[in-house]
Amino acid sequence: MKRAEGAAFVATLGALLAMTAASNDIMVPAQPPIARAFGMPEAAGAAMVGMFSVGFGFGLAVWGPLSDRFGRLPPLYAAAAGYILAGAVCALTDSFGVLLAGRFVQGFMGGVGPTLARAISRDLGGGARTAQALSAATVVQGAAPVFAPLLASGLLVAADWRGIFWALVVFGLAVILSVMLFVPETLPPEKREAPSIRQMGRETRVLMVTPGFLYGTAMVMTVFFGYMALLGMGAAVTESAYGLPPEWFGPLFAVNSVAYVLGALAANRLAGRFGVSTIIRAGALTAGASGVFLLALSAVAPPLIVLWTGVVIYVFAFGTLLALCAARGLEPAGAVAGTAASIMGLAQTLFSAAGAFAAAGLFDGSHRSLCWVMGVSGVMLLVLWAKGRRYL
């Protein structure tokens, strides 16, 4: 009998959370080559991240309420099947427009993963148990940003960009199998509620005046805004400003991913000892320091290693803050965890898309757009924490 505990269960939650990271991080080294393959400018590669994020946001608005009505597993299976189909369309198309449409659908379907991973964690009872489950799953999720760019770089050398989308098809199949084997239904029928516009409106109004939810969501939104600028334009910046070939960006990005995993590990290990609020404070201070550093670098022409030091510090803070701020925001949600997770995820992904498009729009062939977007995000995280620290 499947039980909501154990390493396999946590690993599967991590895989669900990783549907976003796997789908976007694997694209990072390939964005400039894909753009060139379709005769597009390098900055157009950011649209692949942006369209996924927009679709992802709309998906989050759907999967949470559906899971509150029908349980966690039926929407999960349906969306995972759609995710696999969209990946196959992207792999087979010869049209950049169809590719972007496929990325939108892939994002829409992929929204089920983080939404239901968070809702399933909240079903465990809330409080420290939810925070620990999300933090542990986030550590597992960290494998995706470490290995996905390395896999993409290898596929670019051994084959071409289409192999990247076939890899996502295989990942989707693995997620479905893992859910079937290890994840039980955590929302029993007696606790399910039929979604309605009126009910969702009432729930949303309650959440919009709940400070803990608002500050937790704002922190998640802001930390993703800066991170998605890195995903959207990191490869283009290093190739254009520093001459780094796309196939070498995967190993460089893996350094960031290790920093993310270390940040998530620190949050998971230290939150129980020092308290969630203390670790969020440390993450906000780290993010603020990286933001000031990156904004200062925008005024000079730093070596790549100096620029990447600021980026790595930000990503470490990203790993530290993400799961704990999400858990803090969901803690007051109670029985409407699915709707709360959808609202949080929708806000997060729309800001994610905005971060990618902002970095692309500001791109002038130098490092400055990356520094501006990530730097402002880091400083804003510190400001948000200072204003809402009693709730975080």
Explain the meaning of each model-derived region.
Residues 1-2, 185-217:
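Juxtamembrane intracellular "pre-TM" segments in multi-pass secondary transporters
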Residues 8-42, 230-235:
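Extracytoplasmic
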Residues 39, 71, 92-98, 109, ...:
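Helix-breaking motifs and short loop linkers at transmembrane-helix boundaries and internal kinks
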Residues 58-97:
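Conserved MFS/SLC helix-loop-helix module at the cytosolic interface between two early adjacent transmembrane helices
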Residues 82, 86-89, 97-106, 305-313:
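Paired small-residue
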Residues 98, 127, 135-181:
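Helix-loop-helix hairpin linking two adjacent transmembrane segments in secondary transporters
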Residues 102-143:
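Cytoplasmic helix-loop-helix junction between adjacent transmembrane helices
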Residues 278-324:
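C-terminal transmembrane helical hairpin of 12-TM major facilitator-type secondary transporters
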